Amino acid sequence: MPLVSVIVPAWNVAEFIPAAIASVLAQSFTDFELVIVNDGSPDTKALEAAIAPFRNRTDTHYLVQENRGPSGARNAGILHARGRYVAFLDADDEWEPTYLEQQLARFSDDESLDLVYCNSRLTGDSVLAGRTYMDTTPSTGPVTLEALITLTCNVPTTCAVARRQAVVSAGLFDPQIRRCEDFDLWLRMSAQGSRFAYHRAVLAIRRLHPDSAAADGVRMFESQLVVYRKLQSLLGASHQAAPLVGHQIRRAEADLSLERSKQLLMAGQYPEAAEALAAARRFYKSRKLALASIGLRAAPGLVRRMYAGRAVR
């Protein structure tokens, strides 16, 4: 049996997946299997042509299913996997050659760990290209449930290797969640007692797209709210982390209102933008938002020009 199962979900990624697969096959650590999951991709013909050079390898498995989203695709890979560990790689990302070797070394150093993640270099069509993930989304201190809830520690899926049994015991990825589905799983794993650790070695390359899920603020915060409310129900009111979850729900509601306000402002729907901004101000008490609120009522066109493409918080 392989020690590691590398799971690569594929949906509309024929252009990028050869580089992702090549980065797996170039690993210095070789005791792995590769599981590619075609998640009902509309570019299946091109996808299968792209992966054809790799299909005849005994360590490579290709699964095809109807579209179930990233959670359903990763779950199919996990359930097919034979490795003690699962490593997740998005099909448009890549790993450095020592990725698996260095990640697994952390498990050898501390056998109580259930998940290890590292840093990555950002690339693609984004203002963040050239920076590292931990430059923009830091992890600070121990990876506790509280640190995950408050986003003090942030786990990127492409940079994570986990014990397969810990993932299965937590209930796998939730197929009903198509954004922040990884965040949801990490929270559930931590809540059940799984131990996480990170290191800052830059071992992955993450490709950013302007039309990616993370680029849509409204949908991202909507998904965050779904995840936090799910965790609130899971933990119950008596859990020591319950107040933190409640605070994060209020914060995410305010962030969602703020994103909606910006969208409505740019669409010229000024009264609705002012109403959404007022909702955000019930959490955020900044002077800048207070001035923006006054401006939206007195001179909305001017505010629109001033805040086009800028964060108002």
Language-model-derived ranges and their functions:
Residues 196, 208-313:
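C-terminal subregions of glycosyltransferases and related glycan-biosynthesis enzymes
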Residues 1-222:
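Nucleotide-sugar donor-binding/catalytic module of glycosyltransferases
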